[in-house]
Amino acid sequence: MKEYKDLLKLVLDNGIMQENRTDTDAIAYFGTQSRYDLTKGFPLLTTKKMAYKAIFHELLWFLKGETNIKYLVDNNVKIWNEWPYENYKKSPYFKNESIDEFILKIKEDDSFAKQFGELGPVYGRQWRNFNGVDQITNLIEEIKKNKYSRRLIVSVWNPSEIKNMLLPPCHCLFQFFVNSKNELSCQLYQRSADLFLGVPFNIASYSLLTYMIAQVTNTTAKEFVHTIGVAHIYNNHIDQVKEQLTREPLQLPTLVLNKNIKNIFDFKIEDIEIKDYNSHPAIKGKVAV
């Protein structure tokens, strides 16, 4: 996607290297916006191979309101593993297990998973129970009843619960908009964005959410607008980013949803299909915790 490559180049060329809460310095640039036309294909990155099933499982996990990694682990999704593992290492129960041994315990021992697989009141909790409010249900009902509302907003930044989260939400507020052609667009505000590892997931995830909400509200998916506060490229991802910039984007794939689904909470992984996905080879990078 040209829009994503433009974002990488903007930050690489204009950002400033600085320290952050992790042990890895990053090139940071404040204030970006990218727009992805959802009528021209599903915006799944093609300049490196994406594990898109992991993206879909994570979104379904959010929609379930879950905050424990057990569901993700059971479905071989590894993107959240590091945070509960680092938290477990601080506990008196830690016996120098590797992260692989920790994840195996999560998978095989339900009581262990319940105690040590929890992330705190992160995305799923805030989506479905923000101080008692089910924001996703409210959002969809409001689109159905008052689609031109300018209050079609979900907030994940809950100051009263931030301290209890292993990782405060990076993508923290999103808003929907229906135009006079009955086309649905979504804008995400992301306070902090790991451009190499995180952002390709975020683009695909919120685009998928837009398509799903469009289906259950009888609208048509139009555009995903991605607004970022601190866009950053970690020091140990610079070579990977430069490699991506040498690669030409390929044709975008097509998203196919099960048209029989009328309630967003009824979607399962088998109801989401990607067709004609071709990409350049995968590029690995280490997550900063």
From Swiss-Prot:
Superkingdom in the source lineage: Bacteria
GO BP term, example: methylation
Record key words, sorted: Cytoplasm, Methyltransferase, Nucleotide biosynthesis, Transferase
Instruction: Extract the Gene3D superfamilies matched here.
Output: Thymidylate synthase/dCMP hydroxymethylase domain
Q: Which PROSITE patterns match?
A: THYMIDYLATE_SYNTHASE (PS00091)
Keyword set includes Methyltransferase: yes
- Could you tell me one molecular function GO term of this UniProt entry? thymidylate synthase activity
Where found, per UniProt? Cytoplasm
Q: Which InterPro entries match?
A: Thymidate_synth/dCMP_Mease (IPR045097), Thymidate_synth/dCMP_Mease_dom (IPR023451), Thymidate_synth/dCMP_Mease_sf (IPR036926), Thymidylate_synthase (IPR000398), Thymidylate_synthase_AS (IPR020940)
In this chain, (6R)-5,10-methylene-5,6,7,8-tetrahydrofolate is annotated as bound at D194, A288
List the catalytic activities from the record. Answer: dUMP + (6R)-5,10-methylene-5,6,7,8-tetrahydrofolate = 7,8-dihydrofolate + dTMP
GO cellular component assignments: cytosol
Annotated coiled-coil segments of the chain? none
Give, as in the UniProt entry, the pathway in which the protein acts: Pyrimidine metabolism; dTTP biosynthesis
Query: EC number(s) of the enzyme?
Result: 2.1.1.45
Give the family per the record: Belongs to the thymidylate synthase family. Bacterial-type ThyA subfamily.
Assembly and oligomerization: Homodimer.
User: What exactly does this protein do?
Assistant: Catalyzes the reductive methylation of 2'-deoxyuridine-5'-monophosphate (dUMP) to 2'-deoxythymidine-5'-monophosphate (dTMP) while utilizing 5,10-methylenetetrahydrofolate (mTHF) as the methyl donor and reductant in the reaction, yielding dihydrofolate (DHF) as a by-product. This enzymatic reaction provides an intracellular de novo source of dTMP, an essential precursor for DNA biosynthesis.
Protein known as: Thymidylate synthase
Q: Which organism is it from?
A: Malacoplasma penetrans (strain HF-2)
